Amino acid sequence: MSEESFLPEEFQQIVHRFERMMRENQSYYFDREELEDLIFYYSDQFLFSQALSVVEHAKNLFQEHSSILLREAEIYTSMGQLHKSIGLLKKISPLQEHHLDWLMANAVAYSQLHEHDKAIGFLEQAMEISEPENVDDIALEL
């Protein structure tokens, strides 16, 4: 059974629409949330080149929206391109310094670079701003 068969019908249509757009070398409009969902969908399947294609399309539609750049940084971290990831995270830092996903993305990237003190610093900041029910999950990363 394919991964797609477990997706809600509406999201399957979004995936098919995006893939048709890419195949036909067209440009369709997707809202930012749809694009972020597509990025997660492809990243979760380790289809990083497709996820980066979604990122590029999103950047064309929404310039350099910080949430899109954050997702791009997460993809580069997953691909092991850590310096590229950190460069993007630094670029959006003034907009995201108190954003949990941004803090966690930094923690993961710096941890993979074996810069553990920096990683721990980001995790501690994440714990400070996190909802109480999420603190234990973040503490496990320490």
Language model features: what each stretch is:
Residues E33, S67, D101, N134-E141:
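Start-of-helix register in tetratricopeptide repeats
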Residues D37-L38, E72, N106, L142:
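Structural register within alpha-helical repeat arrays
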Residues Q63, E97, E131-E133:
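Short coil turns that delineate tetratricopeptide repeat
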